[in-house]
Each structure stands twice: as structure tokens, then as C-alpha cells.
């Protein structure tokens, strides 16, 4: 059985994926039942005005709780006086509770009363901590369940002393007695008191109530509950036995040491009810009807109708699924109506909403093969909208049996196009695979993986619609072609227009009032015929006329491709009723569109017949506002073409060390041939060319400038920035500094600096003495080899150097010869001493070790 879900749901704010449809959780039901039972218990004991609604409000002062504690203590002392031998078997309270009678709700006195009651329950009654509650649980309603369970346990224990207990305690005793009889168990040592006589339970009513609760699930395979005896049932596939009792108007189930409602028990154990989509609570009040699946209302807005989403949840094999149309939420469905035979530019017409589309797809009638062959005309002769169409189609659907539904349905999708810049609401169908514009179609058993659909009751228009401006120029209305197989209807085949001509930016299909035809050379019938021959699918073929010069008829009123005349088409179809004010405006709008489309077609024909330079290129951006003509190449376009024609520029190798902007790019003065300035310039060129060794892998891309262009427009590589000022003498220091500024690469330094100047750690760290009296120096001591003599004389040489330096600084009248001797002596001493700045260890040949081989003590 095919199921239809909501189509085209409107996007809304993201919420939880699945939301419970119950007004409150079913787990809270047994708490309400217990509060009702405890309220009746306290009302009978103390004559209070208490019920389930004001149960916690009466208890929040602690007065009733302390009063009941004192009552239980008195009953225990009286019971102890009668049977003192039971003191060892049953814990009995010996002391009562102090209570402040002037306590108000929410005050500290009320909290003190509740705290005294809690302490009495723990100390005197021995109630387990699992069943206890705290002061905040009652005052602030933080944990109502613990309060209810504690009072119920107190009622069980106090019943042993002869205090009246809640009704649930009496039901528990009945079930315990039944179990002892069935299992032949002995009675407890202190026999429990006899429960008071109560109204007998009508198990016939119990069976009816259980059957009513279980039958809320209408799945083919329901959760099994087998009756063993009165009030005893076996549930599910296991041998679990449950005891069910009626407490006032509730059906209670004995679970472990507590109670639960049958509805909540089924929600937890029934596989069908454990799903996220539960039953509606309103379904309990409905009269029993024919078995249906689970129905869940899906509502997008408060003012919109509510379709039913039917969900099948059963353990039996499901029937074959008949898939229907599905589109994502970003797309909206628009069914083709009989009003679509009118002019396509009628944008005031109301589009069908997705809410109306879902019943339309579900209730459309499917004609048989004989009906389709005998009456190729449409079955809906007048436009029907809204509830009239839905009621008519739903009446037709009632008479159809479920076995009539075919399999292998090909999904169809109707997607509205985007409105163009002029605001026309033109809708055009976009085909998916093989598309049928009508929503109804009849299928035969598939012979292939995806059989194409046949034509439906509504005849397809034999028209070709021109695409909009914003739409793709290759997608058009699928043409209807005669199928080669006998007994089959028409097959819709999408047509791709030839990309050789530009798309016409019209807003709708070209047509006249009488359905006349127009002949234009811009639409090539030969291209259409070729595309039709290539678009055959499966065993379906397309019959295309052999005459390639046949005019393609573009009309807006034709609906039946096998009809003979315009008069017959007018008789078969009923036009849309137009008002007196809308009709002239519609005709004026049609005339404007026809004139605009004719002009665009003439421009397109002129472009195809013109030269190749005026034709629209196959790539790039086509701007329809230019009148269908591509702008002529002029201005910067000529410069680009000229630069591309000249070919790739010549690449020059440039040395990075001696690189700078060549003198060709600088403004050269006008020099006569043979002048000394020209000779100097040529000499400098020769020197620079000799000093340019080929750098490894470094080239600068340059472009030879045009004759009329300035040298300053020469492009330079972005990685190397040329200096703005020229260096006249490349051998000078200034030239070296100038050349160094333009470099961005690392070069090998002449002298490797110290490791600590580079802020690098040595590979071998020095040993550290952590004794407080011997702290190592922060300056590491270099390693000195014993066979290196000059290194041992380092302190003396330093002293001698200092002496020489001091003498040379103090004496001013020394001759040049003495100064030269002192300089030679100091230079020889400095060369023999290890450099203190670098602190590098020496090898045997006197060369410094590389930085990788340094070691420190």
C-alpha cells in the first residue's frame, strides 16, 4: 500500500528531530495515582481537606507529617504492650517527633518540622535511604517521587502496628497471599493483620479495561497479553507474569516492589510503543473503527490544514511499496492544471500550494489502457481548484481497489523556474529522466531497469517552450513523440536545444491568440531532429519528420498533438474566464512580448548570418542586454592580442650578486655617435656583462617593451625588488651596499660567529656541579688540547697585548717605525692566540672546527 508523506514542507527554524506528541510523560501517571491514594488515606485518618491536586501544598508545613509520626509512635507503643515478644522481630518506634504548630509554608519552622520527620523515619522506623527524601524535595518540589515512595513505605510498616494503610498496601497483600497459595509458601512469622474488607473487584471489567488499553495499538501483530487467571496475565514472548488490579479508575500493574500503570508499562515493553512516534492520547476517546496504521498529524502552520502521515509499524512482511513523487524542502511542487493551456505569461494566476498538492497526488484517478486509447482527450474539461477538485478526486479514489496500484512507478517532479528580472512568474517543467507533465500515468510491467512512463489522460502539448533568462539554455519542454510500440501512448522525451544560437530571453512561450505559427530561421529543426534521434530510451523510439525544412509550430493553445484543426481544439477546451479589466491588460502584455521576442529572434538570425567576429563566442559571459551582439574587439583587447601575437618574451639570466636595474631602463641622454659619453656607457656595459656569471637556477622574467613605450614599464619578478636609485660604480662600497639591499636570499657568511651570538645551544652541555659552595660559571670554558702550545700562552699574550695597547695609547711622540714594529708584534701574537671572540676549538692543522663538531666541558 503506497503511503504519501508531506511534500514540499516549508523551511523553518531547526528544532528537535522527533517531538513527543503526548501532553505529559506516561511515567508521571503512576505518581498521580499514588498521590491520589495517599491523599485519600490521610483524609480518612485525620479528616483533612486534601486531594491529589493540593497534596504537596498541605504537607509542605510539616504539621501533618509530624502528626502522623506521633500517631504511629502511639500505635507502636500500644502494640508493644499487647505483644512484647514481637519487639525483636519488628522494629518499633519508641520516641515521637517535636513539632512547631505555628510554622508557615516556606519558613524555617516548616523546614525544621520536615527535618524532624525525616530524622524520625530514619532512626525510629529504619526506612532505607533509597526511599527517603530531603527537605528541599518537599519544600521546593525537587523530587516528588521520593516523597510519595517514602510515605507509601511508612504506610506499609505502620500497618503492622494496626494503623490503617493506603489501598495500594492492601492490594499488595492480596497479591502476596495469592502467590503463597500458588507456590505453597509458608506464612510469615509475625502474621500480618487482616486487611479491611473492601469492595470486590469485578474481573470482567478488568479484562475489558486491559483489552481496551492493549487495543490502542492497531498493528497487525500486537503485543500479546494472555490471561492466566483473574488479574494475572502473561505478557510478550516470555513467561513473565504480571498482576493487574483496578484502583478506582486506574489499571495498576504490580512491578517488583512497586506499582505502575498499565499504559506506562506497555509504553516501556511493547516494541511498537517503544518507537519515537507514540500513539496520540486523543485516540483513546475515539470510537473503535476499522483497523488503520499509526496516524501522526504533521502541521507546518496553525492556519493550514493538517494532513495525516501514516506510519506502518508491524512485525509482519510489508506489502510492496509504491513510491510517488518526492522533492526536497527547498523545492515546491506545482501540478499542471488545465489552465496551463492558456497563455504562459498569465502571471496573476495563483500557484497551487504544496499543501494542496499532496491530496492532488494521492487522489488522482488512473484510467485503464482501453480508456486511454479510446478517449485521448482530457478528462478534466474545466479548471478545478481547491476543495472541489479534492472532493471530486477523492470520490473517484474510493471506488478503486488497492490492488490496482501498479509497481515500478517512475517519479516525476515539477519544479518552478526562477522569476526573471522583469518579474514574470513563468513556470516551466524541468524533466528528470523521462518526464510527464501530468501527475497521473499508467504503467506496464517493467522490461528494463527504469521503464519510461506512458502518456496519461491529459494530452501533452506539442510545443517547445523557450527558456527564461535565468534558466539554462539547454533545457526545454519535452516534446511528445509517437511510440513505436503498438498499444502504448505518447512518450515525453526532453529536448536539448542546440547551443549554436543564443537563448532567447523571452518570458514565456511564443504564441498567438488563434494558435498560429511563426517561421524563424533561428530555431533549427535539423538540430532538434538530431537531438530527438539521440534521446531514445529503452525500446521507445521517436518518429521525426524527414523534411528538415519543416516549420516547428510554437503555439500556446494546442494541447492534443493528434488534433487536426484549431476549431476542434477550441471546442474541446474551455478557456479561463477573464474579467473585463484583465483581458485588455493581458492582450497588451502579449503584444509587447511578441514584439520583443520577434526583435530578439531577428537579432539572433542576423548574428548567425553575419561574420564570425560578430557571433557570440561559445565561452565567456553572454549579456542579453547588449541586443544579442558581442562587443567588437577594440581598446585594451587589441593590445592583448598584439602582445600574444609577438610570442613569448626572451628570458635573461641575471646574477643575484651583481644584479641591479640595467641602464637600459633608465632614461638615457641623447648622445651623438663617437662622443666620450657613449664610449663610457659602452665600456660600463662590457664590464657588467663580464661580471655576470650565470647564477644557478635564478632567472628574471622580462618582457621586451614596445618601441613607443617607456622603459619604466618593464615588468620585474615579484621576488626580487630592484633598487630605485642607480649605482654608478659597482666596485665601490656604496655599490656593494646597494646590491646587498636588493637581495632576499641567504648567503654564506665569511666568518661563522659564535654559537652564543647566534643564540644556539651547544650539542654537548657542560657538566654542572650542584654543590652550593662550587657553583659552575655561567661562561663555558673552551676545550684546550695539550699539544697546542699557543693556546697555553693565551693569558700572557693577552697581558702583552694589553701592555702594548696601553703604551701605544699613552706615548704620543713615538716614530712611525716603532709603531709599525709594535703593530707587527701584536698582529703576530693575535694570530697565534686562539680568537677569544669565536671560542672555537682548533684542529691539528690550525683550522677551526665546524660548528657541528664543537664540544664543551
Curated annotation (Swiss-Prot):
Task: Provide the protein's localization.
Answer: Cytoplasm, Cytoskeleton; Cell membrane; Cytoplasm, Cytoskeleton, Stress fiber; Cytoplasm, Cytoskeleton, Cilium basal body
This protein's major location comes to cytoplasm
Q: Which residues form the GAR domain?
A: 201-273
Q: Where is the composition biased (Polar residues)?
A: 301-316, 366-382, 695-716, 826-836
Q: Show the GO MF annotations.
A: actin filament binding; cytoskeletal anchor activity; G-protein alpha-subunit binding; microtubule binding
Pfam families with a match to the protein in the record: CH (PF00307), GAS2 (PF02187)
Q: Which PROSITE patterns match?
A: CH (PS50021), GAR (PS51460)
**Which GO cellular component term is one of those annotated?**
cytoplasm
In this chain, the stretch annotated as Disordered covers 1-21, 282-572, 670-716, 759-857
Basic and acidic residues: compositionally biased ranges: 534-550, 559-572, 676-685, 815-825
Tissue specificity statement from the Swiss-Prot or TrEMBL entry:
Expressed in the cortical tissue (at protein level).
Q: Return the Basic residues bias intervals.
A: 1-12, 759-769
Which InterPro entries does the annotation name?
CH_dom (IPR001715), CH_dom_sf (IPR036872), GAR_dom (IPR003108), GAR_dom_sf (IPR036534)
Q: Which GO terms describe its biological process?
A: actin crosslink formation; microtubule bundle formation; negative regulation of microtubule depolymerization; positive regulation of G protein-coupled receptor signaling pathway; protein localization to microtubule plus-end; regulation of cilium beat frequency involved in ciliary motility; regulation of microtubule polymerization or depolymerization
- Which residue ranges are recorded for the region named Interaction with ADORA2A? 432-857
Q: Where is the Calponin-homology (CH) domain?
A: 32-159
Ranges of compositional bias, category Gly residues: 508-518
Concerning CDD domains, the annotation shows:
CH_GAS2L1_2
Summary of the function given for this chain in its UniProt record: Involved in the cross-linking of microtubules and microfilaments. Regulates microtubule dynamics and stability by interacting with microtubule plus-end tracking proteins, such as MAPRE1, to regulate microtubule growth along actin stress fibers. Enhances ADORA2-mediated adenylyl cyclase activation by acting as a scaffold to recruit trimeric G-protein complexes to ADORA2A.
Q: Which family does it belong to?
A: Belongs to the GAS2 family.
Q: Which PANTHER family match?
A: GAS2-LIKE PROTEIN 2 (PTHR46756:SF14), TRANSGELIN (PTHR46756)
Query: What does the subunit section of this Swiss-Prot or TrEMBL entry state?
Result: Interacts with ADORA2A (via its cytoplasmic C-terminal domain). Interacts with GNAS, GNAL, GNAQ, and GNA13. Interacts with MAPRE1.
Q: What is this protein called?
A: GAS2-like protein 2
